[in-house]
Design a protein with these regions (language model features):
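Catalytic cores of alpha/beta
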Residues: 31-43, 155-165
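Glycine/small-residue-rich loop that forms an oxyanion/phosphate-binding "nest" at active or ligand-binding sites
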Residues: 62-114, 118-120
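Catalytic beta/alpha-barrel core
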Residues: 72-76, 96-98, 119-132, 145-160, ...
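Conserved, mostly hydrophobic/aromatic
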Residues: 24, 40, 48-51, 115, ...
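Active-site rim beta-loop-alpha module in soluble metabolic enzymes
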Residues: 165-173
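N-terminal amphipathic alpha-helix/helix-capping segment at the start of soluble metabolic enzymes
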Residues: 1-23, 84-85, 89
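Glycine-rich, proline-tolerant flexible connector loops at the mouths of alpha/beta enzymes
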Residues: 46-78, 130-133
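Active-site mouth loops of central-metabolism enzymes
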Residues: 20-35, 93-107, 148-155
Length: 173
């Protein structure tokens, strides 16, 4: 049996007690994003997903694409967002959603360590196929960052998404 990380253990315990989880998404780098995270944490969020701004967020819809562009236009970068996230200290798990180009460009180990140093518990990399996630997942695991994989409800059982990741597994609808 694989080891459950703190993020997954926390979320499972809450779900197992019959609770629904509230995990809002906030695009890092937008005006007031840090205050939005603090407010969500203070008002019962179980965790928060921080979107790292990216120039071509093809896996996102138009609202998140626009938010990412606005953050970039304001000067945000993954590094500035993670630096700010490291100072949040909100008492709930933080995860990031980022594109594989960001991970690859920094290097798996370096990026995973940067997330860990910023207090990030998990990472969603939606454009990283499960079959190619091994090097990233190994580096993330070594840094104590849980890899959160996404799956469509129609994904075949043989993809075994739940067996090949740590963190929570998101099912898209």
């Amino acid at each position: 049996m694989r080891h459950l990380g703190a993020l997954e253990a926390s979320f499972r315990a809450k779900r197992d007690s019959g609770r629904k989880l509230l995990v809002p998404y906030v695009t890092g780098g937008l005006e007031g994003w840090e205050d939005a995270i603090r407010a969500a944490a203070a008002h019962g969020a179980d965790g928060i997903e921080i979107g790292l701004p990216f120039s071509d967020p093809a896996m996102d819809g138009p609202v998140l694409q626009e938010a990412s562009q606005r953050a970039l236009d304001a000067g945000a970068t993954p590094v500035t967002v993670l630096d700010a996230a490291s100072r949040l200290d909100v008492g709930i798990p933080l995860a990031v959603m980022c594109y594989y180009n960001t991970v690859f460009r920094a290097g798996h180990e370096r990026f995973a360590q940067r997330l860990s140093n910023a207090g990030i518990s998990g990472a969603i990399v939606p454009d990283l196929p499960l079959e190619e996630s091994g090097p990233w997942a190994t580096a993330a695991d070594a840094a104590g960052v849980e890899t959160i994989m996404l799956a469509a409800p129609t994904a075949p059982d043989e993809r075994q998404v739940g067996n090949d990741c740590t963190g929570d597994t998101g099912i898209g609808e």
